[in-house]
Amino acid sequence: MGPLPRTVELFYDVLSPYSWLGFEILCRYQNIWNINLQLRPSLITGIMKDSGNKPPGLLPRKGLYMANDLKLLRHHLQIPIHFPKDFLSVMLEKGSLSAMRFLTAVNLEHPEMLEKASRELWMRVWSRNEDITEPQSILAAAEKAGMSAEQAQGLLEKIATPKVKNQLKETTEAACRYGAFGLPITVAHVDGQTHMLFGSDRMELLAHLLGEKWMGPIPPAVNARL
């Protein structure tokens, strides 16, 4: 029997493109590194407010850098990420509250579907320039992730319940307690210690903390399938 997997938590919001990048890299490595990957749907607007941080859209130079950066990362990481056409509206007006409540409901009721459902919401907003705020948009993502129409509708009906609202609030507050000022954050629990890493570009450091080998963003086992 091999060593027990170490726990790594990923706090993320589908409104955050860098969360998608970190998510995919961790999904590629979770079996290679033998980690217990825990996905934590969170609300980036709550973290921004709590920390006093500002979104890139309010800082023009940062927004321009982000657009160029994601274009380069699309090819480097082989993730089909594209800037939304109406970036400011997506980030500052539409937001992701309903989507993140839906993913919270998925995590509570059908955690085995969380990875695919999260990916399909990212694909909508950060790859195909599609909506993630309307009920039909969320249902379309859920069904594309493999849920039945009835299952998806049942989960959607729970996003306004106190249980789901409170869980999303608690997860967001947990990220803040770890010191988050944005997303994604990766929290590694290793040898009785807890390490919080911000951003999608800290995976080499995560490998070091885990005592594992970093083989680039597309490890050989994954590259063979791409």
UniProtKB/Swiss-Prot annotation:
It comes from Homo sapiens (Human). It is found in: Peroxisome. GO terms for cellular component: cytosol; extracellular exosome; membrane; mitochondrial matrix; mitochondrion; peroxisomal matrix; peroxisome. It catalyses: RX + glutathione = an S-substituted glutathione + a halide anion + H(+). The gene is GSTK1. Pfam families: DSBA. Gene3D superfamilies: Glutaredoxin. This is Glutathione S-transferase kappa 1. Ubiquitous. Glutathione S-transferase that catalyzes the conjugation of glutathione to exogenous and endogenous compounds. Significant glutathione conjugating activity is found only with the model substrate, 1-chloro-2,4-dinitrobenzene (CDNB). Keywords: Acetylation, Peroxisome, Transferase. Its EC number is 2.5.1.18. Its main location: other. One of its GO terms (biological process) is epithelial cell differentiation. CDD domains: DsbA_GSTK.
